[in-house]
Structures are given as structure tokens and as C-alpha cells.
């Protein structure tokens, strides 16, 4: 099963398992994973499965979503992406 490891300054890493359900990320409490960084939008991104692969989608966040230092709108993830 795929896992997402979320690192936030001053906090221990959060490990999220990616199964068949979408996982919503953002500052708002109604997200599956609530993040604390001020640069994170209330509803920032979602991650889920598409055809057996892991897909990360930005939810029109103000500061953007980045994979390997490149801003993305939507991207299929690979092992070791950051």
C-alpha cells in the first residue's frame, strides 16, 4: 500500500496510507489530514488512486502544490517523489 509522509516544521512526520479513498489535505478541520502551516490553504490538495497509481491534485490553493520542487496542478506520483 502506498504511503504519504508529511513533514511540517517543529512537528513529527505524519504517515498517511493511500488506499481506494481520496485523502483531502489542508488547514481546515474538515480535511482528512489537517495541516498547520500558514502557507497551506484551508482545502489545499487531495490525493487518491487512479488506475492503480497515486494521483496528487492541487485544489486551486493560493501557494500551490509542489512535487520535486515543481508546481503542479495534477500529477501521478512515483516512489521517492518529494
Task: Name these PLM-found stretches.
Residues 2-8, 12-82:
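Forkhead-associated
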Amino acid at each position: 500500500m502506498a504511503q504519504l509522509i508529511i513533514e511540517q516544521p517543529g512537528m513529527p512526520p505524519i504517515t498517511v496510507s493511500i488506499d481506494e479513498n481520496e485523502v483531502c489535505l489542508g488547514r481546515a478541520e474538515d480535511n482528512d489530514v489537517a495541516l498547520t502551516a500558514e502557507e497551506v490553504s484551508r482545502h489545499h490538495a487531495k490525493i487518491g488512486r487512479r488506475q492503480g497509481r497515486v494521483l496528487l491534485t492541487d485544489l486551486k490553493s493560493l501557494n500551490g502544490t509542489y512535487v520535486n520542487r515543481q508546481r503542479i496542478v495534477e500529477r501521478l506520483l512515483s516512489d521517492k517523489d518529494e
